[in-house]
Amino acid sequence: MDPNCSCSTGGSCSCATSCTCKACRCTSCKKSCCSCCPAGCAKCAQGCICKGASDKCSCCA
């Protein structure tokens, strides 16, 4: 279990508008929890539940 998410890492979890998960991949809605990307990163906006602002985001690497 991810200590900050009510699901197993890699399992399904509820994807709200914000997420405090560290490594939980929300397979139930095909989104992952990660830092927000800079504006203009469409890939992150479509496949990420933001947990905090960052100019470096794994979704956009």
From Swiss-Prot:
Signal peptide positions on this chain: none
Purpose of the protein: Metallothioneins have a high content of cysteine residues that bind various heavy metals; these proteins are transcriptionally regulated by both heavy metals and glucocorticoids.
Annotated positions binding a divalent metal cation 7: C50, C57, C59, C60
Gene field: MT1D
Residues reported in the UniProt entry to bind a divalent metal cation 6: C37, C41, C44, C60
Spans annotated as Alpha: 30-61
Protein name: Metallothionein-1D
Domain notes: Class I metallothioneins contain 2 metal-binding domains: four divalent ions are chelated within cluster A of the alpha domain and are coordinated via cysteinyl thiolate bridges to 11 cysteine ligands. Cluster B, the corresponding region within the beta domain, can ligate three divalent ions to 9 cysteines.
Record-linked Gene3D superfamilies: Metallothionein Isoform II
Gene Ontology molecular function: any one: metal ion binding
Organism: Sus scrofa
Binding site for a divalent metal cation 1: C5, C7, C21, C24
One Pfam family per UniProt: Metallothio
Binding site for a divalent metal cation 2: C7, C13, C15, C26
Family: Belongs to the metallothionein superfamily. Type 1 family.
Region entry Beta, spans: 1-29
GO annotation (BP), single: cellular response to cadmium ion
Subunit-structure text: Monomer.
PANTHER family per the UniProt record, alphabetical: METALLOTHIONEIN, METALLOTHIONEIN-1G
GO CC term (a single one): cytoplasm
Keyword vocabulary terms for this entry: Metal-binding, Metal-thiolate cluster
Residue positions binding a divalent metal cation 5: C34, C36, C37, C50
Bridged cysteine pairs (disulfide): none
Binding site for a divalent metal cation 3: C15, C19, C24, C29
Record-listed a divalent metal cation 4 binding positions: C33, C34, C44, C48
